[in-house]
A protein has these predicted regions:
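Flexible, polar/acidic helix-loop-strand segments at domain edges
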Residues: 1-67
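Long, intrinsically disordered, low-complexity segments
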Residues: 34, 41, 55-65, 96, ...
Length: 185
Protein backbone atom coordinates (compact mmCIF):
# COMPACT_ATOMS: atom_id res chain seq x y z
CA UNK A 1 0.00 0.00 0.00
CA UNK A 2 1.32 3.43 -0.91
CA UNK A 3 0.37 6.43 1.20
CA UNK A 4 0.64 10.11 0.47
CA UNK A 5 0.57 13.13 2.80
CA UNK A 6 -2.89 13.50 4.30
CA UNK A 7 -3.86 9.82 3.98
CA UNK A 8 -5.22 8.04 7.04
CA UNK A 9 -2.71 5.39 8.08
CA UNK A 10 -3.82 4.74 11.65
CA UNK A 11 -7.33 5.24 13.00
CA UNK A 12 -7.96 5.30 16.75
CA UNK A 13 -11.75 5.23 17.16
CA UNK A 14 -11.72 4.99 20.97
CA UNK A 15 -14.10 2.02 20.92
CA UNK A 16 -13.93 -1.65 19.94
CA UNK A 17 -14.58 -2.74 16.35
CA UNK A 18 -15.00 -6.30 15.10
CA UNK A 19 -12.05 -7.97 13.37
CA UNK A 20 -14.05 -8.02 10.12
CA UNK A 21 -14.80 -4.31 10.36
CA UNK A 22 -11.13 -3.52 11.06
CA UNK A 23 -9.99 -5.77 8.18
CA UNK A 24 -12.23 -3.88 5.74
CA UNK A 25 -10.18 -0.71 6.25
CA UNK A 26 -7.07 0.08 4.20
CA UNK A 27 -5.36 1.49 7.26
CA UNK A 28 -4.46 0.22 10.72
CA UNK A 29 -7.31 0.46 13.22
CA UNK A 30 -6.14 0.66 16.82
CA UNK A 31 -8.96 -0.29 19.19
CA UNK A 32 -8.66 -0.16 23.01
CA UNK A 33 -8.03 -3.92 23.36
CA UNK A 34 -4.85 -3.47 21.26
CA UNK A 35 -3.37 -0.59 23.28
CA UNK A 36 0.06 -1.35 24.72
CA UNK A 37 3.24 0.55 25.64
CA UNK A 38 4.09 1.11 21.97
CA UNK A 39 0.61 1.71 20.54
CA UNK A 40 -1.82 3.97 22.36
CA UNK A 41 -3.77 7.16 21.73
CA UNK A 42 -1.91 10.37 22.43
CA UNK A 43 -3.13 12.82 25.00
CA UNK A 44 -5.70 15.07 23.38
CA UNK A 45 -4.21 18.14 25.05
CA UNK A 46 -1.09 17.70 22.90
CA UNK A 47 -2.94 17.15 19.63
CA UNK A 48 -1.89 19.64 16.97
CA UNK A 49 -4.58 19.83 14.28
CA UNK A 50 -2.44 22.13 12.12
CA UNK A 51 0.57 19.80 11.94
CA UNK A 52 0.54 18.42 8.37
CA UNK A 53 2.37 15.15 9.13
CA UNK A 54 4.51 13.34 11.71
CA UNK A 55 7.79 14.58 10.21
CA UNK A 56 6.86 18.24 10.62
CA UNK A 57 8.51 19.26 13.90
CA UNK A 58 7.47 22.92 14.11
CA UNK A 59 4.03 22.32 15.60
CA UNK A 60 1.55 25.13 16.11
CA UNK A 61 0.87 24.37 19.79
CA UNK A 62 2.56 26.23 22.62
CA UNK A 63 4.55 24.25 25.19
CA UNK A 64 2.96 24.14 28.64
CA UNK A 65 5.33 25.95 30.98
CA UNK A 66 2.86 26.34 33.81
CA UNK A 67 -0.90 26.09 34.14
CA UNK A 68 -3.40 27.59 36.53
CA UNK A 69 -4.51 24.07 37.49
CA UNK A 70 -0.96 23.36 38.70
CA UNK A 71 -1.12 26.46 40.91
CA UNK A 72 -4.45 25.35 42.39
CA UNK A 73 -3.04 21.89 43.09
CA UNK A 74 0.03 23.37 44.79
CA UNK A 75 -2.31 25.54 46.85
CA UNK A 76 -4.40 22.50 47.79
CA UNK A 77 -1.29 20.65 48.96
CA UNK A 78 -0.01 23.61 50.96
CA UNK A 79 -3.40 24.20 52.59
CA UNK A 80 -3.71 20.49 53.41
CA UNK A 81 -0.27 20.46 55.05
CA UNK A 82 -1.27 23.53 57.09
CA UNK A 83 -4.38 21.69 58.31
CA UNK A 84 -6.74 23.91 56.32
CA UNK A 85 -9.07 21.21 54.98
CA UNK A 86 -11.80 23.60 53.75
CA UNK A 87 -9.35 25.68 51.71
CA UNK A 88 -7.66 22.56 50.33
CA UNK A 89 -11.02 21.13 49.22
CA UNK A 90 -11.90 24.44 47.53
CA UNK A 91 -8.62 24.46 45.57
CA UNK A 92 -9.07 20.85 44.41
CA UNK A 93 -12.67 21.52 43.44
CA UNK A 94 -11.66 24.55 41.36
CA UNK A 95 -9.64 22.17 39.17
CA UNK A 96 -12.20 19.38 39.12
CA UNK A 97 -15.18 21.61 38.27
CA UNK A 98 -13.25 23.25 35.42
CA UNK A 99 -12.55 19.79 33.94
CA UNK A 100 -16.06 18.41 34.49
CA UNK A 101 -18.43 17.55 31.69
CA UNK A 102 -21.25 20.07 31.34
CA UNK A 103 -23.95 19.33 33.90
CA UNK A 104 -21.67 17.02 35.93
CA UNK A 105 -19.82 19.70 37.92
CA UNK A 106 -21.34 18.77 41.30
CA UNK A 107 -20.57 15.08 40.78
CA UNK A 108 -16.88 15.95 40.37
CA UNK A 109 -16.56 17.80 43.68
CA UNK A 110 -14.84 16.26 46.68
CA UNK A 111 -15.78 16.94 50.30
CA UNK A 112 -12.47 16.03 51.92
CA UNK A 113 -8.84 15.86 50.89
CA UNK A 114 -5.90 13.69 51.91
CA UNK A 115 -2.39 13.46 50.53
CA UNK A 116 -3.23 10.44 48.38
CA UNK A 117 -6.05 12.35 46.66
CA UNK A 118 -3.68 15.28 46.01
CA UNK A 119 -1.06 12.94 44.50
CA UNK A 120 -3.65 11.25 42.28
CA UNK A 121 -5.22 14.56 41.22
CA UNK A 122 -1.81 15.89 40.16
CA UNK A 123 -1.19 12.67 38.19
CA UNK A 124 -4.51 13.01 36.35
CA UNK A 125 -4.49 16.74 35.72
CA UNK A 126 -0.83 17.09 34.78
CA UNK A 127 -0.45 13.82 32.84
CA UNK A 128 2.24 14.10 30.20
CA UNK A 129 3.44 17.52 31.36
CA UNK A 130 6.80 16.34 32.74
CA UNK A 131 6.04 17.03 36.42
CA UNK A 132 5.44 13.54 37.84
CA UNK A 133 9.03 12.54 38.58
CA UNK A 134 9.66 15.82 40.40
CA UNK A 135 6.45 15.39 42.41
CA UNK A 136 7.30 11.83 43.46
CA UNK A 137 10.84 12.87 44.31
CA UNK A 138 9.55 15.82 46.37
CA UNK A 139 7.12 13.56 48.23
CA UNK A 140 9.89 10.97 48.75
CA UNK A 141 7.71 8.13 47.44
CA UNK A 142 9.06 7.58 43.93
CA UNK A 143 10.20 3.99 44.52
CA UNK A 144 7.06 3.09 46.47
CA UNK A 145 4.68 4.47 43.81
CA UNK A 146 6.59 2.94 40.89
CA UNK A 147 6.48 -0.47 42.57
CA UNK A 148 2.78 -0.03 43.30
CA UNK A 149 1.62 1.29 39.92
CA UNK A 150 4.20 0.34 37.26
CA UNK A 151 4.85 -3.40 37.27
CA UNK A 152 7.23 -3.18 34.29
CA UNK A 153 9.49 -0.65 36.02
CA UNK A 154 9.05 -2.07 39.54
CA UNK A 155 11.76 -4.68 39.05
CA UNK A 156 14.52 -2.15 38.37
CA UNK A 157 13.53 0.93 40.34
CA UNK A 158 15.93 1.83 43.15
CA UNK A 159 16.72 4.75 45.42
CA UNK A 160 19.35 6.02 42.95
CA UNK A 161 16.46 6.99 40.69
CA UNK A 162 15.68 9.94 42.97
CA UNK A 163 18.51 11.68 41.10
CA UNK A 164 19.49 11.64 37.44
CA UNK A 165 22.94 10.90 36.07
CA UNK A 166 24.95 14.01 35.25
CA UNK A 167 26.14 13.98 31.62
CA UNK A 168 29.70 12.63 31.59
CA UNK A 169 30.83 15.59 29.48
CA UNK A 170 29.78 17.95 32.29
CA UNK A 171 31.65 15.89 34.88
CA UNK A 172 34.76 15.79 32.66
CA UNK A 173 34.73 19.56 32.15
CA UNK A 174 34.52 20.40 35.85
CA UNK A 175 37.72 21.64 37.47
CA UNK A 176 39.40 19.35 39.99
CA UNK A 177 36.41 17.01 40.13
CA UNK A 178 34.23 19.84 41.43
CA UNK A 179 31.21 18.38 39.71
CA UNK A 180 31.17 14.70 40.68
CA UNK A 181 28.75 12.17 39.24
CA UNK A 182 25.64 11.46 41.31
CA UNK A 183 26.04 8.40 43.52
CA UNK A 184 25.07 5.15 41.81
CA UNK A 185 25.83 6.27 38.25
Amino acid sequence: VTYKAGDTTIFIPGYEMSLAERASKKYQVLVPSLYNYALFPTLKKFFDPLRPDMTYENGSRDYFVHRLADTYLMLAEAQFKLGKQTESVAAINAVRVRAAAKGKEDAMKVTSVDMNLIMEERARELAGEQTRWMDLKRWNNLVERVKLYNTDAAVGVRDIHYVRPIPQKQVDLSENGGFPQNSGY
